[in-house]
């Protein structure tokens, strides 16, 4: 952990509320050597403009020519487009390379609770390395986000399934509809994360599973959930608001009717296409965000760094085919 804290010690951390490392450079994946990977960080700040002002003064080389527009404009780019994250990539710190995304506390709160973008919330469905520990309010948001991931995944599974199948669903949620899984990402990524992090996934999700009265863990090879209409209706109502909004919008469009959310959810609980409907709603949130955030990352990184990063991603994708 000290190694990762040292990597971000080059940043101005006065406004930082929470920082974590994620991805294959920080979290072990099956058949991968993380010491050779670039380390990805998310930096949650209570004041994005102040963070960028101090960081441009301290580390101008981390930024593309956008730094010339000043911290106020960078904050606007961060907080008004795509997933509300501003990335600096291919930053050399000692012998490692890092990539860090900056997001405001208010935006991360919105994503964790409502799944507005399923971007940072999606990264936190999976195990991460907490480099700067969060306050209790942030801990509660992360737990609520993971509880939502559990409910969503259970709606995608049959009444009986294995622990590994559940973890595959949880890890796979944030890749639903992500165009990078078609071009640019390792095709075996989900399996590598589950296999390399099984114990950590169990540590994170076991307390949430134990709290779920409608789920019984008989053994790692057999979990049983209540598949009744009442249980499905209960789970649907616990989904984040953005997912529920998408479900309502999609079903009303298909059925050419205008019904409120409660009516739509009650109707869906009695149908046989719950999993497909939930998955479509989640994919509908992620798809445009994955495209717009990738474009934004290329814009913030500058041409040279974007080409280097894209080539590395494409190489990983081709090796996995």
Curated annotation (Swiss-Prot):
Location in or out of the cell: Mitochondrion inner membrane
Cofactor(s) named in the record: Mg(2+); Co(2+); Cu(2+)
Membrane topology: Peripheral membrane protein
Any one of the GO CC terms: mitochondrial inner membrane
UniProt xrefs under InterPro entries: Tam41 (IPR015222)
Protein's job: Catalyzes the formation of CDP-diacylglycerol (CDP-DAG) from phosphatidic acid (PA) in the mitochondrial inner membrane. Required for the biosynthesis of the dimeric phospholipid cardiolipin, which stabilizes supercomplexes of the mitochondrial respiratory chain in the mitochondrial inner membrane.
A single GO molecular function term of this UniProt record: phosphatidate cytidylyltransferase activity
EC annotation from Swiss-Prot or TrEMBL: 2.7.7.41
Enzyme class: transferase
Record's cofactor remark: Magnesium. Also active with cobalt or copper.
One GO process term, biological-process aspect: cardiolipin biosynthetic process
Entry keywords, A to Z: Lipid biosynthesis, Lipid metabolism, Magnesium, Membrane, Mitochondrion, Mitochondrion inner membrane, Nucleotidyltransferase, Phospholipid biosynthesis, Phospholipid metabolism, Transferase
Organism from which the protein derives: Caenorhabditis elegans
Catalytic activity: a 1,2-diacyl-sn-glycero-3-phosphate + CTP + H(+) = a CDP-1,2-diacyl-sn-glycerol + diphosphate
Pathway field: Phospholipid metabolism; CDP-diacylglycerol biosynthesis; CDP-diacylglycerol from sn-glycerol 3-phosphate: step 3/3
Lineage: Eukaryota, Metazoa, Ecdysozoa, Nematoda, Chromadorea
Protein family: Belongs to the TAM41 family.
Protein name per its UniProtKB record: Phosphatidate cytidylyltransferase, mitochondrial
């Amino acid at each position: 952990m000290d190694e990762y804290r040292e990597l971000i010690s080059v940043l101005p951390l006065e406004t930082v509320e929470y920082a974590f490392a994620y991805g294959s450079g920080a979290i072990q994946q099956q058949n991968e050597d993380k010491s050779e990977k670039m380390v990805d960080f998310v930096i949650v700040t209570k004041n994005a403009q102040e963070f960028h002002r101090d960081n441009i003064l301290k580390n101008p080389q981390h930024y593309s020519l956008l730094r010339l527009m000043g911290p106020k404009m960078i904050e606007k780019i961060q907080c008004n487009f795509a997933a509300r994250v501003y990335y600096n990539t291919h930053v050399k710190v000692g012998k490692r390379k890092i990539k860090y995304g900056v997001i405001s506390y208010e935006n991360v709160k919105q994503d964790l609770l409502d799944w507005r973008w399923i971007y940072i919330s999606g990264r936190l469905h999976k195990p991460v390395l907490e480099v700067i520990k969060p306050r209790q309010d942030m801990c509660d948001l992360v737990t609520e986000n993971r509880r939502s991931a559990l409910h969503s995944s259970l709606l995608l599974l049959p009444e009986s399934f294995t622990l590994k199948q559940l973890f595959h669903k949880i890890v796979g949620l944030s890749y639903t509809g992500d165009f990078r899984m078609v071009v640019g990402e390792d095709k075996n990524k989900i399996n590598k994360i589950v296999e390399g992090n099984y114990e950590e996934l169990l540590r994170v999700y076991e307390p949430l599973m134990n709290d779920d009265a409608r789920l019984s863990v008989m053994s790692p090879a057999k979990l049983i959930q209540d598949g009744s209409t009442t249980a499905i209706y209960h789970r649907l109502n616990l989904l984040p608001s953005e997912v529920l909004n998408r479900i309502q919008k999609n079903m009303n469009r298909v059925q050419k009717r205008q019904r409120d959310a409660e009516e739509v959810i009650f109707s869906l609980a009695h149908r046989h296409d719950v999993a497909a409907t939930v998955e479509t709603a989640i994919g509908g949130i992620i798809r445009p965000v994955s495209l717009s955030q990738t474009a934004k990352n290329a814009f913030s990184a500058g041409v040279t760094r974007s080409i280097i990063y894209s080539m590395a991603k494409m190489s990983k994708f081709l090796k996995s085919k």
